[in-house]
Amino acid sequence: MLTLKKSMLLLFFLGLVSVSLADDKREDEAEEGEDKRAAEEERNVEKRCYSAAKYPGFQEFINRKYKSSRFG
């Protein structure tokens, strides 16, 4: 009976460690995804600013496009 309890305790401990490691990995992947999205959004803003400066009518086009897509 004592051997069974030790085995069960060992399995429980190993399961907790495994779940903890998987959770940490999942959080790290989520943070990497957020960083990638933020960097991509920053590049898009820079491109829009560059295009708005280069082409005079571009900013009005973008404003109309986003207003119509946001409000249906």
Curated annotation (Swiss-Prot):
GO terms for cellular component: extracellular region. Keywords: Amidation, Amphibian defense peptide, Antibiotic, Antimicrobial, Cleavage on pair of basic residues, Disulfide bond, Secreted, Signal. It is found in: Secreted. GO terms for biological process: defense response to bacterium. Residues 23-48 form a propeptide. Residues 1-22 form the signal peptide. It holds the Pfam family FSAP_sig_propep. It comes from the Eukaryota. Belongs to the frog skin active peptide (FSAP) family. Brevinin subfamily. Antibacterial activity against the Gram-positive bacterium M.luteus and the Gram-negative bacterium E.coli. This is Galensin. It comes from Kassina senegalensis.
